[in-house]
Amino acid sequence: IHEGHINILKTANKYGEVIVGLLTDEAIASYKNIPHLNFNRRKIIIKNIKYVKKVIPQRTLDYVENLNLIKPDYVVHGDDWKTGIQKKTRERVVKTLRKWSGRLIEPKYTKNISSTIIKNKILEIGTAPQNRVSRLKRLMNSKRIVRILESHNSLTGLIIENLKVKKKQAYHEYDGMWSSSLTDSATKGKPDNSSVDFSSRISSLNDMMDVTTKPLIFDADNGGQIEHLSFLVRSLERSGVSAIIMEDKIGLKKNSLFSNQKDAKQDKPEIFSKKIRQVCNSRQSDDFLVIARIESFILGKGLKDALKRAEIYSKAGADAI
């Protein structure tokens, strides 16, 4: 919230009772990253502003659904949408208002301030680990598809942090990072067989976390020894990691992209489930996700085996498969 928003609300209040259509997390996530505050927390702030009579959810970027629901005498919006990405949205609002002789009021846009500018200032300061941990879960609850890209150092992390592509009416970007044991090992000139230990990987990970704010998934291969998992989870949460993903293979790690998997072996479902439960019992927050990666297809065991394992792992506490 900034003075531009207050100016809009103050102007709207001159024309009657003010109803605010507040974009849901899902609506915001459809064209940019999710907001720092979730819908309910934003709603509490808005409805306690003295100019506001009521707050209703706006579930899409299009205003027509709410306009037909309320049939307001006036719609108040800054004049910045006369050009640019929201121009067609404005045209639909004008067309809809004509049905009941409604009017569009457009106060002059407040320059040199925007929610994007404020957000970028916040990002310059950085984000607390506990805030970052919860972001992946919020993304998965808000978006149909969450886009994650591999990152193995600070530079690749910054690419993921800043890359945006304009497509039709929205900007598209990656939602988070994936710390891959394959690329982490490759950048160190070592094979992808767990030669690079977790301590070394977490050191590289912390460098990435220093210069980025997006959530990160940590690929932990098969998770290692069950007795060590609780210490790994604590280190990851302390760094702000959002999720750990473990595969149900055993023995010396062999990359699943290799065509020859004859020596690879799959863990017994009941034993791998113990690892999942160990992570669940070790995490400080339920927002830290446990993802089980099932290798049945890679090892030629097929869908039936994979589905059986998926059900067992879900019951053990896996948040995602």
Regions picked out by a protein language model, each given a short descriptive name:
Residues 1-130:
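Nucleotidyltransferase catalytic core that binds NTPs
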Residues 130-321:
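Alpha/beta enzyme core
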